[in-house]
C-alpha cells in the first residue's frame, strides 16, 4: 500500500527544527502539488530551488515530517511561474507515482496542508490561531481551544458469501473502478456497528462474522481506513442505494475484474480474496 515505503523510515514526530538548503519544500494549491517529473519518477523542490523567490521562505516554513534523514516542510507564497522545471500536478498522481516514498510524502503533506489552511481561525471564538511550539496542534490564545490534525475513521468492507465477494462502483464520483463497500464511522457507534450499518444502508444486506483485517492512513480524504471481512447473513438480493452507488455485484474469485496495484487497502483486500488467501 502507499504507506509501505520500506526500507525508508517515516518519522512523524513533531520536531519543528529549521530547514536547510537541502530540505524538501512542499507547496500546494487546491488539490495540486508542485513537483518535477523525471524519467525515473517525481521529485519535489528543495529550499535551495526556492530561496531566490522568497527571501523569508526559511522563516515561514512549517515542519511536517522526516523520511530517513530527509526533512519535509510546508511552504507558501511562491512565484512558481519562475520555476519552469516544476509543474502543478493533481494529488491523484500520488497513487501511482515513483519513488513510492516521495508519493507518500506528497499526499501526507497534502493532508497537513489542508488542515493548516482550514485552522487559521478558531471555530469557537473566531480569533486567529497559532502553531504550538511542542505539538502538532493549532492553539487559540484567546479562548484556549486546541485543534489537532483531522483524521476521520472509516471502514472498507469485504462482504463475502462462500467463494463470492460483493463489489461496487460509486455514483457521481470521478473514480469509476470497482471498489468495496465503505463508509465513515458515526457518533456513538463501534467500528463493527459501522460495518453493519453501511452494508444495510448501501445494499440492504445483513452481515455476520465481522473480522478485522488491516488499516491504512488515507490522506486523500483525511481518513484512517480499517478493513474488515464479513459474511453474508441471509439472502443475496441487493437493495441498492443509488445516491451512493452506481451498482453492486457479486463476483466469484475467478471472475473478479481487478488487477493488483500498490496504492490502496481496498485493492489489497480484493486481491487477497481473488487469490484464495482469505
Give residue ranges: language-model regions.
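N-terminal strand-loop-strand
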Residues: 28-35, 137-180, 206-207, 230-232
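Active-site-adjacent beta-strand/loop module that shapes the phosphate/pyrophosphate-binding cleft
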Residues: 216-239
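Active-site proximal loops enriched in glycine and acidic residues that flank catalytic Cys/His/Asp
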Residues: 169-170, 182, 211-216, 232, ...
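Cys/His-rich short segments
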Residues: 108-158
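The catalytic Nudix box helix
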Residues: 179-214, 228
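Nudix hydrolase/Nudix homology domain
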Residues: 1-119, 174-178, 220, 241-278
